[in-house]
Amino acid sequence: MTSEQTFIAIKPDGVQRGLVGPIISRFENRGFKLAAMKLTSPSRSLLEQHYSDLKEKPFFPGLVTYMLSGPIVAMVWEGKDVVKTGRTILGATNPLASAPGTIRGDFAIDVGRNVCHGSDSVESAKKEIGLWFTPEEIQNYKLNAFGWIYEKE
């Protein structure tokens, strides 16, 4: 199995609303492996780096302020096509366009309070993981369930 990693963050609204467990369960139930996780209060500098591609957008200052408003659960998930599938699990950025059964479709209404963030490409995932985690914080272990989830190649 060819495995990749993605960065998923539960935003302050998701933490405050007690959605950490249900969100983690969605990824575990799908068959992905949790490789790193921490509850953190990021710096303004980290958030500005993380969202650097949105720096020129009018909503950027409000986004950074919102992300500073409470703790965030930062995670690295691993598995086959986890970036693409992770985005599907999250749902559309705008919760009103998200299908029922997705995290945002089930738990969010406003785009500015859409509960979580997920990397949009393998390249973005590598960048984001490098911003939020040191290599030592990412666990490399065998998840025995992978043998029951993936066909042998």
Swiss-Prot record:
What EC number(s) would the UniProt record show?
2.7.4.6
What is the reaction catalyzed? a 2'-deoxyribonucleoside 5'-diphosphate + ATP = a 2'-deoxyribonucleoside 5'-triphosphate + ADP; a ribonucleoside 5'-diphosphate + ATP = a ribonucleoside 5'-triphosphate + ADP
Gene3D superfamilies tied to this protein: Nucleoside diphosphate kinase-like domain
One example GO MF annotation = nucleoside diphosphate kinase activity
Would you name any one GO CC term? extracellular region
Catalytic site: 117 (pros-phosphohistidine intermediate)
Q: Which cofactor does it need?
A: Mg(2+)
Q: A Gene Ontology biological process annotation? A: anisotropic cell growth
User: Any idea which UniProt keywords this protein has?
Assistant: ATP-binding, Kinase, Magnesium, Metal-binding, Nucleotide metabolism, Nucleotide-binding, Phosphoprotein, Transferase
Q: Which residues bind ATP?
A: 11, 59, 87, 93, 104, 114
Q: Which InterPro entries match?
A: NDK-like_dom, NDK-like_dom_sf, Nucleoside_diP_kinase, Nucleoside_diP_kinase_AS
PANTHER family according to UniProt: NUCLEOSIDE DIPHOSPHATE KINASE
Name the family the entry cites: Belongs to the NDK family.
The protein's matches in NCBIfam families, at most eight in alphabetical order, are given as: PRK00668.1 (NF001908)
Q: What does this protein do?
A: Major role in the synthesis of nucleoside triphosphates other than ATP. The ATP gamma phosphate is transferred to the NDP beta phosphate via a ping-pong mechanism, using a phosphorylated active-site intermediate.
What protein am I looking at? Answer: Nucleoside diphosphate kinase
Taxonomic source organism: Emericella nidulans (strain FGSC A4 / ATCC 38163 / CBS 112.46 / NRRL 194 / M139) (Aspergillus nidulans)
